[in-house]
């Protein structure tokens, strides 16, 4: 199998995203390796050794995705027995011309601390944790968005992702069996109607997920899951709460759709 | 100010990472906009209108970062009054040649659900939540890593990030004032010594953070913060627990360093 390396003198997150996006266009398998924080000659030489070994082992040159712009370690990496792809390079000169500014390559800028957005994110994570799963219903004033939905429809991971990635304060509140007889927006959520965003999920997927947690229970029964999904969707429609179906969506897609539909501003860029 | 647009028929996360990495090389400010899920002609035309307005408003052509490969909406976007940057394009033909395979562009592949890694991540988030802050000390068998450190040194956001991004099960355990008189590894953590990873932080930064939460308390006093930091660092050294100082690091950098130092495998690629 062909090896793919994502390498950088920083976190290598940019190289990973770049490499994955490109390789995902090709219907074949790769062996993935990330090497972060190549900041010294020693580390660059160690990386070179790993890459060269992968090439010998695989019989075909490893693919190396990197973002070194001007760096003495770049030469070491470029001397590897591998095919190199640097996604910044083709764009730097055209952008310099367009902006009429010279690029100033500084390592660690993309995924390092930018004071303001950092504090936002930590605060948002704390907010998501203390306002998870209806555990605190007195602090919705502070929320940017309040996710609602039945148990296991994706509320908690989505709230945390909104906080960690975007610094958005997302509370979440679950509709449970007790609410179902006459499902309505609870009184403490009413003043925040405009912040509500609904998640729903296909009943069959919900049955499967709940069955994995509590097999043969009322909670995971087909009858219960179908009823809960039907009731919340009715509520969303009657109360004009925007909602999405999370069945086929990743956390990244759920949160990107929430941002698109609500127009919420991300604090981190 | 020049406008920068990150657009895609998917989440636009790849466009954002690509655009930010490039623009971070230039010492100037931009107005950032993300437009996700451009899946229809209507949405492409609406995006075009927003982009053209930004160009008129700013007096200079907006910068548009996108990853459309083969797509009918691409033509609409390419007809905008803007400068376009497509980071996949320069690399597709060389990679096709190297791999001797034709690229098969499929939208939504990079940040959509890959069944296996999706379940890992949700499970890991649940694990991080139930094993946060020492709230459960009976389930460390299942942990991939156990973060330790004083209160407010970055354990919780790092655990959640490891779970959400990489599907890694990270528990975390806080050393508090009660532990300080004779700081040692608690008995329930001893069997998992090899999973321990320490976080530390500069005392002054710790004072500032704690002061923001509980001003004028023993918890946030200079004396207390200095003592706690000194004691945990002594423990890490005596017990040979690998550790990093999080003071100047973002969550992305902390977790990338943890992966590098522990050699932990990420479940998501």
UniProtKB/Swiss-Prot annotation, chains A, B:
Keyword Transferase attached: yes
Keywords, alphabetical: Kinase, Nucleotide-binding, Serine/threonine-protein kinase, Transferase
E.C. number(s) listed in UniProt: 2.7.11.33, 2.7.4.28
InterPro entries: Kinase-pyrophosphorylase, PSRP
Enzyme class: transferase
Role: Bifunctional serine/threonine kinase and phosphorylase involved in the regulation of the phosphoenolpyruvate synthase (PEPS) by catalyzing its phosphorylation/dephosphorylation.
Protein name: Putative phosphoenolpyruvate synthase regulatory protein
């Amino acid at each position: 199998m062909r090896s793919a390396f994502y390498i950088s003198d920083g976190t290598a997150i940019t190289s990973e995203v770049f490499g994955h996006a490109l390789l995902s266009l090709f219907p074949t398998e790769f062996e993935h390796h990330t090497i972060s924080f190549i900041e010294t000659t020693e580390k660059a030489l160690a990386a070179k050794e790993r890459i060269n070994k992968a090439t010998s082992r695989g019989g075909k040159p490893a693919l190396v995705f990197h973002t070194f712009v001007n760096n003495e370690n770049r030469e070491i990496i470029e001397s590897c027995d591998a095919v190199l792809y640097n996604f910044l390079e083709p764009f730097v000169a055209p952008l310099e011309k367009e902006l009429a500014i010279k690029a100033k390559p500084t390592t660690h800028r993309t995924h390092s601390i930018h004071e303001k957005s950092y504090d936002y994110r930590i605060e948002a994570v704390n907010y998501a944790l203390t306002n998870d799963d209806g555990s605190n219903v007195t602090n919705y004033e502070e929320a940017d968005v309040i996710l609602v939905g039945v148990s296991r429809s994706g509320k908690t991971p989505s709230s945390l992702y909104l906080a960690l990635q975007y610094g958005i304060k997302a509370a979440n509140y679950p509709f449970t069996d007790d609410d179902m007889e006459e499902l309505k927006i609870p009184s403490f959520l009413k003043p925040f109607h405009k912040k509500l965003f609904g998640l729903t999920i296909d009943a069959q997927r919900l049955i499967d997920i709940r069955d994995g947690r509590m097999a043969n229970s009322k909670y995971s029964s087909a009858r219960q899951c179908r009823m809960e999904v039907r009731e919340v969707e009715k509520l969303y429609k009657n109360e004009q709460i925007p909602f999405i179906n999370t069945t086929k969506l990743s956390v990244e897609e759920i949160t990107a759709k929430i941002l698109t539909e609500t127009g919420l501003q991300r604090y981190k860029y």
